[in-house]
């Protein structure tokens, strides 16, 4: 999908040119999806449905910051699924990074997270969010140490990189009338689409992970690739299917 990047601020015009060249974005207007380079952030808009609002990556404030401060720490479901233990620093590849929220939670809990994203739109939004977060006095230092982004195919990356844990959260068709599907996710999914190769990605993840693979699924979704997990950790909306290969180490992974 060809996505234009619109910039109406002359002070940002050079940056807009750099981003268009780097990511292959267009400079013409669109009747459907388009990116906006604003002084505050890079944002995605569904132009034919403006009520959906702008989608951007924010690791500093809003719901992500609230989750970091009050989300339950290592007692929350995602931490249990990853297998976090006191004194153990886990290397994680988030092979379906999306808007980076789960990756951020894991990094805030001490994991070293490499986010993989093959969508140029998603990767550009993530990079913009990371750059702003790196400058933040409260979280910037550990963000630089623990969160990084790789743009490209997750399957290819996993063929050449081993890690402690691989985390997968592939796009899955939501129930049409589900109130759980947030507006911004509807916009985001409209651009990146479904992960039709998610089943094969599980096998690549199992080959790359030393300790386990964690797959986040809607509570109504079948197991990825119809492969039964070692265990599942359920939440109100989702579940984490955990495929254990071997026990976590008692010290640094």
Curated annotation (Swiss-Prot):
Subcellular location(s) of the protein: Cytoplasm
Sites where the protein binds S-adenosyl-L-methionine: 101-102, 117-118, 169
Cross-referenced InterPro entries: 16SrRNA_methylTrfase_J, SAM-dependent_MTases_sf
A single GO cellular-component term on record: cytoplasm
Pfam families named in the record: SAM_MT
General function of this protein: Specifically methylates the guanosine in position 1516 of 16S rRNA.
Protein name: Ribosomal RNA small subunit methyltransferase J
Protein's organism: Psychromonas ingrahamii (strain DSM 17664 / CCUG 51855 / 37)
